[in-house]
Design a protein with these regions (language model features):
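N-terminal Rossmann-like FAD-binding beta1-loop-alpha1 element of flavoenzymes
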Residues: 26-56
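Helical element adjacent to the flavin cofactor pocket in flavoenzyme catalytic cores
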Residues: 227-302
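Mobile amphipathic helical/loop "lid" adjacent to a hydrophobic cofactor/ligand pocket
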Residues: 96-97, 101-220
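Glycine-rich FAD pyrophosphate-binding loop
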Residues: 46-72
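Conserved FAD-binding subdomain of flavin-dependent enzymes
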Residues: 66-69, 74-106
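Active-site-proximal substrate-binding core of FAD-dependent oxidoreductases
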Residues: 474-497
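Helix-loop-beta segment of a Rossmann-like dinucleotide-binding subdomain
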Residues: 168-182, 210-257
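C-terminal segments that line or cap access tunnels to active or ligand-binding sites in enzymes
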Residues: 300-302, 307-482
Length: 497
């Protein structure tokens, strides 16, 4: 029997000669960026390439990237990416896998303010809300839910494709595989144009759709239709966050991936060829980065960039690439998060009696006189939420604006306040239609995640881009072309069932 056990592998190798010609796995992979994209990339790369590969995550600041918290009087509050949609399956999987807890949604009444008055105010009675919506907007709200659901249904095909190990070498191919020409149209026209063509009223677009764009992306209805639809999904019910802060997902994924975190700012990447005696030359990437002890570097088989490229973001020089890696026009939009512990000046919003004001979330229409995009009562990351209660006279309010609020503006919004914390972000792309995407494959084994943000920026989009990049890197390394850029995948997978 021992002899037979030794013979079996030899017989299998003879029957499957291709097994012997499989390329060895990479020995070292670098991920640039420790936000949700980079941490998810490390997690998925470990899954695909196995235990033997060395994984380095290069992060210039704290893990979490644009997922961050601010401390206000001893409690921490979400200051960056705050909410997760119930259909965000990667984020749901991460939270379950890492044993994290879900913070319940904060339930407070909302209103839409146009700079002079509230054009819509929620009631605590759902029946009254239904009548109000019908009176103001007819069937537009119901039709919008169906319109967004149709787009999300197509987009959710990505989970099946990725579950079956399929990857895409460009963002355009990925999106076309999900939604065909419908998605291409949504990327090439504004949300205003897309919804007008779909028969939505201008009043509804101005008073409901535009405020959703402003709270989620700090921009109006000139953003492309695709990101607009994602933004509308971001104001639906069932949104949640991670207890203790969404950034816990990032540190948890990196720990789970057994990746080594190297604190440093990447300054350049250069292709290198190492010649081995009697063997084929080995192609590597030399990554140079700044640390607290000076300039240093290392070489890697594969590099995944999970930080937005650009002079104000990840300002990386690509040296001696042939052809050269071009600069991508990649402007990001500035959003200022201001957390204020204080009493809202309700008279600014037309309520002379503070006792009569019951709103805990205020969205705004597009009015050049308005210096805020939205404001709302928030709970600490470790709290159980407001549970639908009315805001307390003194609460912590989160204000989104495009510019830092002046003292005069704060005094207009609040009758009194104890503390103010400010966090400026280059939070998401400055969107414009038609949208152009940077490539995913920058060089043979050099990949770029953040281009998918130009379709829509969200935690889940970063996780999807991360899994796609990990699958793509794996298939390209091992020459599995049948798993890359397959046409009509939706139909193919249906017939496999």
């Amino acid at each position: 029997m021992p002899g037979l056990r030794r013979l079996l592998p030899l017989l299998l190798a003879a029957l499957c000669p291709s097994a012997l010609s499989l390329r060895h796995g990479p020995s070292k992979i670098a991920v640039v960026g420790g936000g949700i994209g980079g941490s998810a990339a490390a997690y998925f790369l470990r899954q695909k390439f196995g235990r033997s590969v060395q994984l380095h995550v290069l992060e210039k600041a704290a893990l979490g990237g644009r997922l961050d918290t601010l401390d206000v009087e001893g409690d921490s509050y979400e200051a960056g990416g705050s909410v997760i949609h119930p259909l965000n399956l990667h984020m749901k999987h991460f939270v379950k896998e890492l044993g994290l807890s879900v913070a319940p949604p904060q339930g407070s009444l909302a209103g839409v303010y146009n700079g002079e008055e509230f054009v819509f105010e929620e009631s605590s009675w759902s029946f009254i809300n239904l009548l109000k919506l019908l009176w103001h907007y007819g069937l537009n709200p119901l039709r919008m839910s169906m319109w967004v659901e149709d787009i999300l249904d197509k987009f959710m095909r990505i989970y099946r494709f990725q579950m079956h190990d399929y990857a895409f070498s460009s963002n355009e191919r990925l999106l076309h595989a999900l939604g065909g020409d419908d998605f291409t149209r949504l990327l090439n026209q504004t949300i205003d144009e897309a919804m007008q063509q779909a028969g939505f009223s201008q009043k509804f677009i101005n008073q409901v759709v535009c405020p959703a764009m402003r709270v989620n992306y700090g921009q109006g209805v000139t953003i492309p239709g695709f990101v607009g639809a994602v933004s509308l999904a971001g104001v639906q019910s069932g949104l949640w966050s991670v207890k203790g802060g969404n950034k816990l997902v990032c540190s948890g994924l990196i720990y789970s991936a057994k990746a080594e975190v190297i604190p440093g700012t990447v300054v350049s990447i250069e292709p290198k060829t190492r010649h081995k005696r009697g063997g084929d030359p080995v192609k590597l990437y030399e990554v140079t980065y700044n640390t607290s002890s000076g300039l240093t570097g290392d070489t890697y088989d594969i590099v995944v960039i999970a930080a937005p490229l650009g002079r104000k973001m990840a300002n990386i020089t690509f040296r001696n690439f042939d052809p050269p890696i071009p600069e991508f026009p990649n402007p990001y939009h500035q959003t200022i998060t201001t957390l204020v512990h204080g009493r809202l000046n309700t008279s600014f919003f037309g309520y002379q009696d503070p006792q009569a004001f019951h709103l805990g979330a205020i969205f705004t229409t597009d009015n050049p006189k308005l210096f805020i995009n939205s404001l709302g009562v928030v709970s600490p990351t470790g709290d159980t939420g407001t549970g639908g209660k009315l805001p307390l006279p003194s609460a912590v309010w989160k204000v989104f604006s495009n510019e830092e609020l002046t003292k005069e503006q704060l005094n207009l919004l609040f009758s009194s306040y104890d503390s103010v914390k400010v966090k400026p972000w280059l939070a998401y792309p400055q969107y414009s239609a038609p949208e152009k995407f940077p490539p995913i494959v920058l060089h043979e084994q050099l990949y770029y995640l953040n281009g998918l943000e130009r379709a829509a920026s969200a935690m889940e989009m970063s996780a999807i881009a991360a899994r796609n990049a990990a699958l793509l890197a794996f298939h390209r390394w091992h020459g599995h072309s049948a798993r890359v850029d397959q046409e009509d995948l939706h139909e193919k997978l249906k017939t496999e069932l």
